[in-house]
Amino acid sequence: MSITQERKQELIKNYAINDNDTGSSAVQCAILTERINNLTEHFKSNHKDHTSRRGLLILVGRRRRLLNYIKKKNVSEYLDLISKLGIRKIK
C-alpha cells in the first residue's frame, strides 16, 4: 500500500519549508500520514492481514516520535501541522 511518486511529490511541495526541502520533519510526517491512511483503508477490506497491521503500528510509532520531536522544537509548528494533517494531539 505504497503511495505514488506523484502523490509524494505533491505532499513534499505542500509541506516543504523551501524548494529543496524533501526530508524535514513536517514532510516526513505528511508522507507517513498518507501511508497510514492508505493502510487503514486496506484493512477495511482485508481485516485478517496481520502482517500489514504490524507494519501499520510501526508507522504510527515512527510518526508519533517525529511529532514529539516537532512539539519539543516548536509548539506552534506542531499545532499547525496536526491541524493540516487532521490528526489528534499527542499527550
Curated annotation (Swiss-Prot):
Disulfide bonds: none
GO-annotated molecular function: rRNA binding; structural constituent of ribosome
Keywords: Ribonucleoprotein, Ribosomal protein, RNA-binding, rRNA-binding
Superkingdom per UniProt: Bacteria
CDD domains in the record: Ribosomal_S15p_S13e
SMART domains hit by this protein: Ribosomal_S15
UniProt KW Nucleotidyltransferase keyword: no
Record-linked Pfam families: Ribosomal_S15 (PF00312)
Gene Ontology annotations for the cellular component aspect, listed alphabetically: cytosolic small ribosomal subunit
Record carries keyword Ribosomal protein: yes
Family stated for the protein in its record: Belongs to the universal ribosomal protein uS15 family.
Known partners and oligomeric status: Part of the 30S ribosomal subunit. Forms a bridge to the 50S subunit in the 70S ribosome, contacting the 23S rRNA.
Chain's role: One of the primary rRNA binding proteins, it binds directly to 16S rRNA where it helps nucleate assembly of the platform of the 30S subunit by binding and bridging several RNA helices of the 16S rRNA.
The protein's name in its UniProt record: Small ribosomal subunit protein uS15
